[in-house]
Structures are given as C-alpha cells and as structure tokens.
Amino acid sequence: MTVLIQGAGIAGLALAREFTKAGIDWLLVERASEIRPIGTGITLASNALTALSSTLDLDRLFRRGMPLAGINVYAHDGSMLMSMPSSLGGSSRGGLALQRHELHAALLEGLDESRIRVGVSIVQILDGLDHERVTLSDGTVHDCSLVVGADGIRSSVRRYVWPEATLRHSGETCWRLVVPHRLEDAELAGEVWGHGKRLGFIQISPREMYVYATLKVRREEPEDEEGFVTPQRLAAHYADFDGIGASIARLIPSATTLVHNDLEELAGASWCRGRVVLIGDAAHAMTPNLGQGAAMALEDAFLLARLWCLAPRAETLILFQQQREARIEFIRKQSWIVGRLGQWESPWSVWLRNTLVRLVPNASRRRLHQRLFTGVGEMAAQ
C-alpha cells in the first residue's frame, strides 16, 4: 500500500523527499492545476536547514538565496531594540533567505514526477482495518497505509480529522512584497516596530529585497477592503517612521510583487485520526512573527518519516503528535506574543514596550534562541 500526501507545498514536498529516501511508495496530489508557490520571500533558520539537510544539498540550496546571520529589531525612530541570530552560537551556518519559488524548485528537484498529480484532491476517506480507502476527484480509489494532510491553513483533509477546528484572527493584516534593492549589510534582516504596525525587510537575492508590512485591524473576518491597497497607499501608512524604517518605506512603491493576507493561527488538539495525519499549517498554522512556520513543517516531515519507517501503524501518529505538540505550542505562543507587542499603539504603551524589550537580559534571549533553534534535526544528531 502507498502513502498518500495531499498538498504540494513545503510540508508535502519535504515529506515526499523523506519517503523517497526511505524507499517508501508515495503519491502526492495537489488540488491546484499547477504547483505554484503562493508568496514572496521566506527565511529558513538553522533548525529548518538541519531538517532539510536530510534530503537536500545545503550548499546548492544556499546558491539559490542569501545567507542570513540574524535580524535587528528597531523602534520607529530608528533606534535599536534588540538583535536576534538565525542559528545557535555553535552552528556552522546561519540562516537562509530566498524566494519561495526557489525553495519549491529545490524540493521538487529529483522527485519522481509520475507520483505527483495536479488538479486532483481527496473527496472521501473511509476507514479500513489496516488502511484508509481514499477516493480522489479524478475517480480513482486507493488503499493507503497512511494519508497525510499537508494542504495548508485552509486544509480540506482537516475537516475529516478535526471538523470543529477554527482559525483565530491575530488582529493584524499583512502585505508581502519584493522590491529591487540591495541592503548595505545584506546578511542582516530588520524589523521596525511602530504604533500598531511593523515593517520588515530581508535580502533574498543579490538584487531583490523581501519586505513585509503589518497593520493592526479591528475585525475578526479576514480579507476585506484592507486587501485592496496599492504600494503607494501602503507606503503612506509608514510615513511616521524615521531612520532605516523611513528608508524601507520609500522603497515600497517600487514593488514588483504584492501579496496580501490576514495573519491567523490554528491551535487545538487533534492532528490525527486512524491512519490520517495533519502536518505543517494544516495541523498548527501560526503567525509568522518568529519566521518559524516553514521550519515547523520541515521538522514535522523529518520526524513523521522516521517514526513511520520504524512503526507503520496508526498508533505512531499519536506518538508523532505527542513528540511535536509541546514544541509547536511554545513557538506558536511566542509568535503570538510578538505580534501582540507589535500592535501596541498609544505613545505610552509603545514607550513601555520598547523600554521593556531593551531591558530583557541577554541570558534570557539566549535561552529563547536555544529553544527555537534546537529542532528535531538537531535532537536526532545528538
């Protein structure tokens, strides 16, 4: 029997690579008519790269993007709030920033294309004694030893595993764009915290910079008129920024790509049912404030493949969640807190936030970095 994966995003492709390496038969279906990554830039910290190194040549992957040493966080007046590395102090590599399509291309490279079907999705899952009988939208029926929902935050497989799941709106909306620019220090990303808004920037190629811009919104329903904003109108929201924030805001009108979405998260208790399991955003979508969403998907794929190879049975999926949920929940909560801090608006609250952030001891920051960057790949190597 085969393993069926739905979703040709980062999680699904990474898992297909892991199963290929392990010699396990798999079939991947993608409901879109083509494999086309949605988004602009992406960052991979050292824990993400360790998980990827199982099936990818990292030297080749680094040639697709730009090395990332860390991120500096600034106040809206341009003064420094804090600095955060992209790896543990002893890591031989830092992080990596690149276009999303470059990461997808790397994950697709070498995969058996005959095992990937686009324009196809799961329409029915029926439990068997030792398998799941899956009907696809093309009419074919497959008896599967394992079904994996890697189909993102709007997962349809999740309706089978966890029908009561609901997304929680973060109170922020976000625009992601690419501008033609090279930073003076291209290995350092930056984020500027203002009054209810943030502006981030990362070099993703020698001549392109990824920019993300968030605004606090007072609604719970996603995707309303806030999405219909031109780069020129978006830049005007950051007119009160000084220093490096002002420099980045002036680049926004030159955007060659502009993608908008609200920031949402998914927290709950049910990732598996029978021989069906969710991974990545389908299981635990989180706000992107720590840049760990893709890393969590890659860690999921790394661990699930290893556990399944050792014990290909339904109970393994329960073990998978047990081994992952504490780490996922910690990072989800930390990311949510960062987003909330960025939403503070009044002059008094912004002053208090900035003061408190500057007062955080370096030892506390190092402990946080240790927990962030010690993923399943590092644990397996120890």
Swiss-Prot record:
The keyword Cell membrane does not apply. It catalyses: 2-heptyl-4(1H)-quinolone + NADH + O2 + H(+) = 2-heptyl-3-hydroxy-4(1H)-quinolone + NAD(+) + H2O. It is an enzyme of class 1 (oxidoreductase). Gene3D superfamilies: FAD/NAD(P)-binding domain. Induction: By LasR. Keywords: Monooxygenase, NAD, Oxidoreductase, Quorum sensing. One of its GO terms (biological process) is quorum sensing. Its EC number is 1.14.13.182. GO terms for molecular function: 2-heptyl-3-hydroxy-4(1H)-quinolone synthase activity; FAD binding. Oxygen is essential for PQS production and anaerobic P.aeruginosa produces undetectable levels of MVs and display reduced killing of prokaryotic and eukaryotic cells. Involved in the terminal step of the biosynthesis of quinolone which in addition to serve as a potent signal for quorum sensing, chelates iron and promotes the formation of membrane vesicles (MVs). Catalyzes the hydroxylation of 2-heptyl-4-quinolone (C7-HHQ) to yield 2-heptyl-3-hydroxy-4-quinolone (PQS). PqsH is also able to hydroxylate HHQ analogs having alkyl side-chain lengths of 3 (C3-HHQ), 5 (C5-HHQ) and 9 (C9-HHQ) carbons, however catalytic efficiencies are significantly reduced for substrates with alkyl side-chain lengths below 7 carbons. PANTHER family: FAD/NAD(P)-BINDING OXIDOREDUCTASE FAMILY PROTEIN (PTHR45934), FAD_NAD(P)-BINDING OXIDOREDUCTASE FAMILY PROTEIN (PTHR45934:SF9). Belongs to the 3-hydroxybenzoate 6-hydroxylase family. This is 2-heptyl-3-hydroxy-4(1H)-quinolone synthase. It comes from Pseudomonas aeruginosa (strain UCBPP-PA14). The lineage of its organism: Bacteria, Pseudomonadati, Pseudomonadota, Gammaproteobacteria, Pseudomonadales.
